[in-house]
């Protein structure tokens, strides 16, 4: 959210008071102000915040200069204690370990933030039971646009007070109440003030124990939320009972861009219900139906309207128990989603023998940046089809093939893809039964200057690679100048001595300026090599974590 500094016409009128406050700033806050001036993209300066507060009609006037200065000092101390700076539009106290006393101090701060647009106090358990004190001050922050209260242990009284306060913040655009179980069964109380013409653009209600009745209410409310762009109802399994109502409401949210129904207990019937709404969601960019294990078979007869989502960029169907008929049906639809950038079909075991045509047609998705098909039990034919199609995916940045055993011994099928992938940043080949020849091929590709953009490489759980293979790899990994994370851990049941390749790895690390994490779990280091690692840790100023889980 851009927060540019604005000069008000009343600056001249408030000069005496501003001058007094600036004296205070020159004392205890001079250093803080200097740091802010150095950051050209920073939020408003503390002096701006206090000056605007001084001229604001909404802030309660203080009876004397001494009281004003005392309040400023208390507020500054509170923010500094939490490692925060005074800003006039954004107050982010996410995961700050706020205590009950802190909450009281924060409430006292609100009158000095009349231009506040964003308030985030998520992941602070002590917020629960104290929200009334905040909502009673909502009229002082009537410009609020973003309110995040995720995982705050809100009580029934909290959510009721919140619902009554919404009419005092008519500019609200984003609301996050995720991971608050008391929201469930009380959604009408919370959203009762949302009326036609509401400016709300984002509603996130993840894991809120929503009931079927909540879903029915939401379905009736949706037609009033014409500005809604993001709706996340993930991990609320009971709303499946009111999916008809929700889908009916979705037909009136033509501006919706993100719909997340991850782990909502969706069934085969659910796909047909949602399919009827898709034709009205022409602006949808992201659709997440993942982790709905009873969804399998639902796409067999009802994927037709998916093709209407012309602007869809992200489709997540991982762990949906897709059947062979589902895959066949999706083969007719997914290749037509020409704007698709991210596709996740992982953990659908039936794809292994039925996805040859689908994977072959991925070549028609030139914008695809992320392809995740780990743990799909791919077979030789399907992997070959994927390898041939992947050559045409020049924009690919994330490629995850982990837990597909057929990759082992066949990495050569991806040789052209690896050579042509100028944008690839993440490559995951964990538990792919890779053999020495595979890792030697990978080393050769790296040595010749390919995969230059790679940032994360996962080769873990490939225990069949011999020491000679690891030596070739470690001798060449130094050419991956942008590498941040590398994982070569062994399986949990396997322990193995490190070979001489470990010295090559240590040398390579000195040539990798970005590396921060190296996974080496269950590799056994002899005493001499452990000493080398300790010396390396002491000599190098960079922070690199060797994750070994305790060398044996």
UniProtKB/Swiss-Prot annotation:
LRR repeat ranges, renumbered to this chain: 227-246, 255-275, 283-293, 311-331, 339-360, 367-387, 395-415, 423-443, 453-475
Annotated disulfide bonds: none
InterPro entries on file: Leu-rich_rpt (IPR001611), LRC31 (IPR042419), LRR_dom_sf (IPR032675)
Basic and acidic residues composition bias: residue spans: 31-41
Positions of region (Disordered): 1-65
Keywords: Leucine-rich repeat, Repeat
SMART domains for the chain: LRR_RI
Positions with biased composition (Polar residues): 42-58
Annotated PANTHER family: LEUCINE-RICH REPEAT-CONTAINING PROTEIN 31 (PTHR24109:SF3)
Name recorded for this polypeptide: Leucine-rich repeat-containing protein 31
Organism phylogeny: Eukaryota, Metazoa, Chordata, Craniata, Vertebrata
């Amino acid at each position: 959210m851009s927060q540019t500094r604005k000069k008000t016409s009343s600056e001249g009128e408030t000069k005496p008071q501003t001058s007094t406050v600036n004296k205070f700033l020159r004392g205890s806050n001079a250093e803080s102000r200097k740091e802010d001036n150095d950051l050209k993209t920073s939020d408003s300066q503390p002096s701006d915040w206090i000056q605007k507060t001084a001229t604001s009609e909404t802030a309660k006037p203080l009876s004397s200069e001494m009281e004003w200065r005392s309040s400023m000092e208390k507020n500054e101390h509170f923010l500094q204690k939490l490692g925060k700076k005074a800003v006039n539009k954004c107050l982010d106290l996410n995961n700050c370990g706020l205590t009950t006393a802190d909450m009281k101090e924060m409430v006292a701060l609100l009158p000095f933030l009349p231009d506040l647009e964003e308030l985030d106090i998520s992941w602070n358990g002590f917020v629960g039971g104290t929200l009334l004190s905040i909502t009673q001050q909502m009229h002082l922050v009537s410009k609020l646009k973003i309110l995040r209260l995720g995982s705050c242990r809100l009580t029934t009284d909290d959510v009721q007070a919140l619902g009554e306060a919404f009419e005092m913040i008519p500019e609200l655009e984003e609301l996050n109440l995720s991971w608050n179980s008391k929201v469930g069964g009380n959604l009408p109380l919370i959203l009762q003030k949302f009326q036609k013409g509401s400016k709300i653009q984002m509603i996130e209600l993840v894991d809120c124990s929503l009931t079927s009745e909540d879903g029915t209410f939401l379905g009736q409310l949706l037609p009033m939320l014409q500005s809604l762009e993001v709706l996340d109802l993930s991990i609320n399994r009971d709303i499946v009972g009111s999916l008809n109502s929700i889908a009916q409401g979705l037909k009136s949210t033509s501006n919706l861009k993100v719909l997340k129904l991850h782990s909502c207990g969706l069934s085969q019937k659910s796909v047909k219900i949602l399919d009827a709404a898709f034709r009205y969601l022409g602006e949808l960019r992201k659709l997440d139906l993942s982790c709905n294990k009873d969804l399998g078979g639902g796409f067999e007869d009802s994927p037709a309207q998916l093709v209407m989502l012309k602007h869809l960029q992200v489709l997540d169907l991982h762990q949906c128990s897709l059947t062979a008929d589902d895959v066949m049906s999706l083969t007719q639809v997914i290749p037509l989603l020409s704007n698709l950038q991210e596709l996740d079909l992982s953990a659908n075991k039936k794809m292994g023998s039925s996805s040859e045509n689908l994977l072959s047609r991925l070549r028609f998705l030139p914008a695809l940046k992320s392809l995740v098909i780990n743990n799909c039990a791919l077979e030789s034919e399907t992997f070959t089809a994927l390898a041939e199609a992947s050559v045409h995916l020049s924009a690919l940045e994330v490629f995850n093939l982990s837990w597909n055993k057929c990759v082992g011994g066949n990495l050569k099928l991806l040789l052209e893809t690896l050579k042509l992938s100028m944008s690839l940043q993440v490559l995951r080949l964990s538990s792919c039964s890779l053999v020495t020849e595979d890792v030697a091929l990978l080393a050769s590709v790296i040595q010749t200057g390919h995969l230059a953009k790679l940032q994360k490489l996962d080769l873990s759980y490939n225990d069949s690679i011999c020491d000679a293979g690891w030596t070739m790899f470690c001798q060449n990994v130094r050419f991956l100048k942008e590498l941040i994370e590398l994982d070569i851990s062994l399986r949990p049941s396997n322990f193995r001595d490190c070979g001489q390749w470990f010295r090559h790895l240590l040398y390579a690390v000195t040539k990798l300026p970005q590396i921060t994490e190296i996974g080496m779990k269950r590799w056994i280091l002899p005493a001499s090599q452990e000493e080398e690692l300790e010396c390396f840790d002491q000599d190098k100023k960079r922070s690199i974590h060797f994750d070994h889980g305790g060398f044996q």
